């Protein structure tokens, strides 16, 4: 996501979008849905080749994971001015996002650890059907969406070196 947004910044695409009738929500949804669909299609092919039982649940888990990481990538890309800066900014996010699920998979963790959003994604990708966890994950996605919306709005207001 960082490379996509930073390429748009370098080509001044965001300058055009800031003055166009495109809404911030449409911009965010276009990025998130396009990458989510691509990752879901790939996940579905992988699940089919591995003969997984719950292909649909696994694909939904992949789609939700893609949405969360795309939204986090948009937040970081809105603050980064170069690819190196984006990579440095993404390191703490990656640690926060990946360490608990790795520990959850490798160790026998308590049930409260299953409320962590990325642990929920891992359990969905594994094929577990838990609709309460899906609702929790959707709620977290909505919260992250509004945070992303705030960051993208503030970055669009600063486009072109002038605060609008």
Regions found by a protein language model. Name each.
Residues 31-32, 62-63, 90-91, 138:
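Residue-level recognition of transmembrane alpha-helices
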Residues 1, 89-101, 137-148:
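Hydrophobic alpha-helical transmembrane segments of multi-pass membrane transport/permease proteins
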Residues 15-19, 81, 123-126:
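Short amphipathic alpha-helical coupling elements at transmembrane boundaries
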Residues 1-20:
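Transmembrane helix boundary and interhelical loop/hinge segments in multi-pass membrane proteins
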Residues 42, 46-50, 73, 98-105, ...:
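Structural signal for membrane-spanning alpha-helices in multi-pass inner-membrane proteins
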Residues 140-164:
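Junction motif at the cytosolic side of a transmembrane helix
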Residues 80-119:
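Transmembrane helix segments
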Residues 24-25, 32-81:
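Alpha-helical transmembrane segments and their short interhelical loops
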